[in-house]
Amino acid sequence: MAAQSAPKVVLKSTTKMSLNERFTNMLKNKQPMPVNIWASMQQQQQLASARNRRLAQQMENRPSVQAALKLKQSLKQRLGKSNIQARLGRPIGALARGAIGGRSLPIIQRGLPRGGLRGGRATRTLLRGGMSLRGQNLLRGGRAVAPRMGLRRGGVRGRGGPGRGGLGRGAMGRGGIGGRGRGMIGRGRGGFGGRGRGRGRGRGALTRPVLTKEQLDNQLDAYMSKTKGHLDAELDAYMAQTDPETND
């Protein structure tokens, strides 16, 4: 009942024009055309680019800028190629790619394990200048010094001191330079840095095909382009697959 007795609301600013008529009038009265705006924008950009070109020409004509450009060219000529392969080919101190983990070790690299150019857990650390022994002493070694040489199962890891079996029971690594079979020193698994699970048959480096320089370059570039997390996961999977008995 209260709603019926409410006074009627009358809006003073009402209009009888329909929406169609209103929008039609708005379209007719539209002032600037989009083409004109676009043309004016292009003209402003051309003016600005002409100013920039003049400024760049003035900068090039300055003697200080010319001297800096000449210095930059001579520096590039002095350094030669600056791509990643040229930088990787240069030695990094004593751990150069020709000294320990380099391309000039065909005998050891012929015996690359299934990991390609991967070694133990400290591959990347050693090549970038670290030493990173994981835990134990040097002879026991942990999974340590294996600089991308194909030394199987971690390089300098062994199980004993320098008294048992040459340099200890594999003090130069299982399948490293002294394998448990007829390797060079003591008892390791494999020949000379080879894959060998043959326990004395010496399946290793000398039976592998020789890798060319291009193949080694491609493997190394692919390895260096991977991220650290990807390499760590891949290396952990490889170590768990090949060395299940030494999970410490």
Swiss-Prot record:
* Positions of disulphide bridges: none
| PTM statement from Swiss-Prot or TrEMBL | Asymmetrically methylated by PRMT1. Symmetrically methylated by PRMT5.
Ranges annotated as biased composition (Gly residues):
157-195
- Give one Pfam family, short name only: FoP_duplication
User: What molecular functions are annotated in GO for this chain?
Assistant: methyl-CpG binding; RNA binding
The highest taxon in the source lineage is: Eukaryota
Sites bearing N-acetylalanine, chain numbering? A2
Q: Name one GO biological process term.
A: in utero embryonic development
- The chain residues annotated with the modification Phosphoserine are S40, S49, S64
Keyword Phosphoprotein: yes or no? yes
> Keywords on this record?
Acetylation, Isopeptide bond, Methylation, Nucleus, Phosphoprotein, RNA-binding, Transcription, Transcription regulation, Ubl conjugation
The listed location of motif GAR motif is 194-203
Provide GO CC annotations from the record: nuclear speck; nucleolus; transcription export complex
Q: What are the subcellular locations of this protein? A: Nucleus; Nucleus, Nucleolus; Nucleus, Nucleoplasm; Nucleus speckle
Interaction with PRMT1 as annotated region, ranges: 153-206
Q: Which residue windows are coiled coil?
A: none
Q: What does this protein do?
A: Plays an important role in the ligand-dependent activation of estrogen receptor target genes. May play a role in the silencing of fetal globin genes. Recruits the 5FMC complex to ZNF148, leading to desumoylation of ZNF148 and subsequent transactivation of ZNF148 target genes. Required for the tumorigenicity of glioblastoma cells. Binds to 5-hydroxymethylcytosine (5hmC) and associates with the methylosome complex containing PRMT1, PRMT5, MEP50 and ERH. The CHTOP-methylosome complex associated with 5hmC methylates H4R3 and transactivates genes involved in glioblastomagenesis.
Put simply, this protein is called Chromatin target of PRMT1 protein
Species of the source: Rattus norvegicus
